[in-house]
Each structure stands twice: as C-alpha cells, then as structure tokens.
Curated annotation (Swiss-Prot):
It catalyses: a tRNA precursor + 2 CTP + ATP = a tRNA with a 3' CCA end + 3 diphosphate; a tRNA with a 3' CCA end + 2 CTP + ATP = a tRNA with a 3' CCACCA end + 3 diphosphate. It comes from Thermococcus gammatolerans (strain DSM 15229 / JCM 11827 / EJ3). It comes from the Archaea. Belongs to the tRNA nucleotidyltransferase/poly(A) polymerase family. Archaeal CCA-adding enzyme subfamily. GO terms for biological process: RNA repair; tRNA 3'-terminal CCA addition. Its cofactor is Mg(2+). Mg(2+) binds at residues 65, 67, 119. It is an enzyme of class 2 (transferase). ATP binds at residues 53, 56, 142, 161, 170. Its EC number is 2.7.7.72. This is CCA-adding enzyme. Keywords: ATP-binding, Magnesium, Metal-binding, Nucleotide-binding, Nucleotidyltransferase, RNA repair, RNA-binding, Transferase, tRNA processing. Catalyzes the addition and repair of the essential 3'-terminal CCA sequence in tRNAs without using a nucleic acid template. Adds these three nucleotides in the order of C, C, and A to the tRNA nucleotide-73, using CTP and ATP as substrates and producing inorganic pyrophosphate. tRNA 3'-terminal CCA addition is required both for tRNA processing and repair. Also involved in tRNA surveillance by mediating tandem CCA addition to generate a CCACCA at the 3' terminus of unstable tRNAs. While stable tRNAs receive only 3'-terminal CCA, unstable tRNAs are marked with CCACCA and rapidly degraded.
Length: 454
C-alpha cells in the first residue's frame, strides 16, 4: 500500500465517530455537573478540570478513560488538600457506578461510570510552573498548553499514539518506559505531523535536546540545570516541559523503547503498512519447549508484596534481579537474562546456563608471602601453590535453588530495600511456573518480549 492509503485507513479506525464524541461530551458534562453540585454541597473552594487526552481531543476511538482533577486554592495546606480532596472524590463517586481508593503521590478515587473509568484526583489550582506543589498539578497546565498549540493536528497525534502502541513503545509507566501521550503531543506540535516525527527518529536522537517553549533562553539557569541533570542520567531525549523548565517530559523513556521506535520508524518509511499500527497477535508458545530447545534452566521467585504500587515495586525488583545476577555469576552460574513483574504475586525470573554446578569450587588466594597469604594458609584445610599464588578448594551446594537459599540466608545478595524480607520468604521454583506466568515465561525465554524485529 502507498503511504497515503495506509494513513487514511488507520485514521478511519482510530478517529472517534460522531456518536462516540457525543457520548464522551455528554459524559463529561454529567460529571462536571455532579462535581460542581458536590463541591457546593460540601462548601468547598475547589474547581473541576478535565485533563488528559479526552480534554485535548487526542484520544483514540474506544479509549475513554476520564481524568477529572479537583483543584484547590494554592493556600490550602497539603494535608488539608489530601483530606478534602479524597472526601470530595468519594462524594462524587457515590453518584457514579462504583469506586475504590487508589494511591500515587496522594490518595485519589478511581471510579466507573457508564462503562468508563474515571479518576478523581485532587490537585492545586496552578497558574504557572512556579505554583506547582505536587507532581499532578502540571496536568492542568499540560492540557491548556496542548489545546492552545495543537491547531487542528489532533489526528496527527492519534496516528503517532497508535503507531507507538502498535510497536509496543507507548506509555511512560514504570513497567513500559515508553513515550507518554503528552510527549507524543509535544512532538507533533513541535515538528508538524506524524510523518515529520517518524522521519526525524535519527535527528531527534542526535539533536538530543528539544525545547518547544525556549526555556533555555527564557529561564537559562533553571533549564540548564535540567539539561545537566538529565544528561548525567544518560537519557535518550531531553524534552524540556513546555510548562515547566525543571522537568524532562521524556525522563521515563528508556533507550530500549527509543531504539524500538528508531528501527520501526525506518522500517515503516521503507515499507508502509497498517500492520505497524495494528500488528497481528504474536503466536503463543510453550516455555517448557523453549527450555528444552535452549538447554537452559529457569528459576522463578514468587514474592508476596500486596500493598506496594508498581512505581515503587518494579525498580526494587529490577535491583534485586541485578543482585541475583551478580551473585550467581560469582558462584559459577551463567545468568543469560532476567525478567521481573507482577501477575498477582510479584516475580523474578532468571535464565541460567545450568541448574547444577560442580561440587568442588576452587578458591584462588593471595600471594603466599603476604599477611593475607599467611591468613589464607591458616584458614584452609588444603592449600597449594601455583607460582606465587595460593589456592584451595571447598565443597559447595550444587543445585542453584540450594545456592539461592543459602545466599539469602547469609544476606549475600543485594536486594531492593523495601522487598528484602519478602524475597527471603519467596517461593523458589525450578523449570516450572504457575499457569498465570506461563505466557510471561515463554515471552521471556524466547526473547519475544523484547524482540524488535518481530
């Protein structure tokens, strides 16, 4: 297909219909009315704002999550905002179909109404970046900036969002680390269209710094501090937030997800296809078949951490997986890869070159004529010399599961601070996972989870 045909077909599938727009508009009007009534009933000084893709008209057909922010005056103490904001959110949610309390920087209410998820989030009623007190406050400014600058390019944003979803690079959540919707909107506003953005996949990487509101000129001291900090963190891109020079919009974007975007953009421009936007479902496979084919071993730790949110949990799981990788390699096992996540219980998967090691481990020691050499000689039962260096041996546990248990008992693995105790109590499985993890184990072992050529 020609490029124009591809884009035309995709737009027809992702642009909301008139009926869908009418439904969304009516829903938002109902929610605004309910919010205003509840604010008045409770005697609160607050204003409801819709933020996010519905408020900017950059949402994809069928994607109707609503973000309703409940903005309190700047002089409101933070604890009072949290308390009254949650009270107001609950009062609004009582008029809806169902709700629960969720937690981010502060508690908020997650509700359902007419089949649509509605997040009711307390925030400050900010006018500019200097007013920002909490992370969510910027959302009001983001919505305002996009609406003022998009100038009818809504479908271009939709194309970019759908492309990023199709290549598995969309979402700034900690378990994705891709492009946020706001970043997609900024790139279209800055460069003009979906095609302009994908054509600049290489240029963006080389340019590195994107400053749509010229903060480096208007607030050089603040903006340069942001650039320096993010450069030291080795980010793929530094996109200075158009509404706040202190923030890099692409701070959560990983090199892996940018690399995926980089190669898929090249492939799409060479051979345009609707499949980039709506890829076929990958064939399912058996993790046990993969294990047999690879001749490797799979160790899975199942960890109970019910009250920990993903943004806190996942970095700690990753740190722990790296700790296991380093320690097991010191113990003589080759770690070919690891995977972490949560499917009910949290998990750490480790692929190893083998499940058992030799019963005897050689211990290289120091040179014999040193104080450490004399100490090594005293402490070991069998000692021999090769040249100037001392050597000994010791009997060790062979099974990797036994080795892991011993390492955890002796506190010899660097683990995430908040989950150390939970990992010590983890169930450790060898070459087996429960049913809910079978697909994850296959995707991990086959590397289809990360394969950018698929």
């Amino acid at each position: 297909m020609e490029m124009e045909e591809v884009l035309s077909e995709v737009i027809q599938r992702i642009r909301p219909s008139d009926e869908e727009r009418a439904f969304v508009k009516g829903l938002m009007e109902e929610l605004r009315t309910i919010a205003e009534e509840r604010i008045e009933e409770l005697g609160l000084d607050a204003r409801p704002y819709f933020v996010g893709s519905l408020a900017k008209d950059t949402y994809l057909a069928g994607d109707h999550d609503i973000d309703l922010f409940l903005a309190f005056p700047l002089e409101t103490p933070l604890e009072e905002l949290r308390k009254k904001g949650l009270e107001l959110g609950k009062a609004i949610a009582e008029k809806l179909d169902s709700h629960e309390i969720a937690y981010a920087e502060h508690p908020y209410v997650r509700a359902r109404y007419r089949g649509v998820r509605v997040d009711l989030v307390p925030c400050y009623d900010v006018g500019n970046w200097r007013d920002v007190r909490t992370a969510v406050d910027r959302s009001i400014l983001h919505t305002r900036w996009v609406n003022e600058n998009l100038r009818g390019r809504n479908d271009e944003v939709r194309l970019l969002k759908r492309f990023l979803k199709g290549i598995n690079a969309y979402g700034s959540e900690i378990y994705v680390r891709g492009f946020s919707g706001y970043l997609a909107e900024i790139l279209v506003i800055k460069y003009g269209s979906f095609l302009d953005v994908v054509e600049k996949a290489d240029f963006l990487l080389r340019q590195k710094i994107i400053d749509p509101e010229n903060w480096l000129r208007k607030e050089p001291e603040v903006a340069l501090k942001t650039v320096k900090r993010e450069t030291e963190e080795d980010r793929p891109l530094i996109v200075i937030d158009p509404v706040d020079p202190r923030r890099n919009v692409s701070a959560n974007l990983s090199w892996e997800k940018y690399g995926r975007f980089y190669f898929k953009s090249i492939e799409f421009l060479e051979n345009p296809s609707v499949g980039f936007f709506f890829p076929p479902e990958k064939p399912k496979g058996s993790y046990l078949d993969e294990l047999r084919k690879r001749g490797t071993a799979l160790v899975t730790l199942l960890i109970n951490v019910p009250d920990m949110v993903d943004d806190v949990l996942l970095p700690q799981l990753e740190r722990s997986a790296r700790g296991f990788e380093r320690t097991l390699e010191r113990e003589g096992f080759g770690v070919l890869g690891w995977d972490v996540g949560r499917k009910g219980r949290a998990f750490i998967m480790l692929e190893l070159d083998r499940e058992r090691r030799e019963r005897v481990k050689i211990k290289p020691g120091p040179e014999f004529f040193t104080e450490r050499g004399r100490d090594f000689y005293r402490k070991n039962e069998k000692v021999w010399l090769i040249g100037k260096r001392l050597y000994s041996e010791k009997l060790v546990r062979e099974s990797v599961v036994d080795v892991i248990i011993e390492l955890l008992e002796k506190n010899q693995v660097s683990l995430g601070k908040g989950i150390r105790d939970a990992i010590r109590r983890a169930d450790i499985l060898l070459n087996y996972v429960p049913k809910e993890l079978e697909e994850e184990a296959y995707l991990f072992l086959s590397r289809e989870k990360w394969n950018i050529k698929g």
